């Protein structure tokens, strides 16, 4: 008889839905270790605007995959899958259960379904692309990408050299476009996954939470946090880090494109739009159990019962 696959828990949900609070309570009840699934929490020096767990929360429930990139660096779904699989294996080796918590749905999808077989990076090919960029400019290379792979060309900004370089590198190594290769399915996740999504039943409650959270961020020094990033001089609004909701709007304020009240208003609106996209993803998600943010005890009981009954 084959050995059963190890358990894992996905705790998904829109921003400001109470994922972190529930995850901390779950760690008190179950032998779990937390892995962050959030494309904003990976960045160092971006704590307030991302609502990164604070020292008290991390002391109660340490999170893996926080603060692993500088804001000038990119981080792909493939990078996440590699890192998450390693952390999950380490947690299982310790006799515990991986609890993946966050709202970056693309990361969950990559982890659950696997990724396309993209070629490994080739330093020589990458160096050749860098030389061309220095001679002709990234906009010239972006035009080349649009010709060979219109879908990727439309998705990748000319001022995002890391992603632009990778798309060209993939084509030059494999002879196939990034769009072609990403249609090929990868290896599925070798775990028994219990999937949960937490959100308030009333959308108005979520909107209120988002607005209150943004106000608290401003009070906690969000403007000063973004100003420190702005003054570095090596960051720009086309980087994935600065495109994070809240940061892009505050960046516009610091650049003189709007006043602070307008930046806050835009930030709240952008966060609401993010939550709407996350909920849309989740509504189409298979094998998902919904939890109500307004009934934390029931949510806790639902998850713990599911895990304890699956032995």
Curated annotation (Swiss-Prot):
It catalyses: adenosine(37) in tRNA + dimethylallyl diphosphate = N(6)-dimethylallyladenosine(37) in tRNA + diphosphate. Pfam families: IPPT. ATP binds at residues 13-20. The keyword Magnesium applies. This is tRNA dimethylallyltransferase. Residues 38-41, 162-166, 243-248, 276-283 are annotated as: Interaction with substrate tRNA. Keywords: ATP-binding, Magnesium, Nucleotide-binding, Transferase, tRNA processing. It comes from Photobacterium profundum (strain SS9). GO terms for biological process: tRNA modification. The record marks 104, 126 as: Interaction with substrate tRNA. The keyword tRNA processing applies. It comes from the Bacteria. Catalyzes the transfer of a dimethylallyl group onto the adenine at position 37 in tRNAs that read codons beginning with uridine, leading to the formation of N6-(dimethylallyl)adenosine (i(6)A). Monomer. Its cofactor is Mg(2+). It is an enzyme of class 2 (transferase). Substrate binds at residues 15-20.
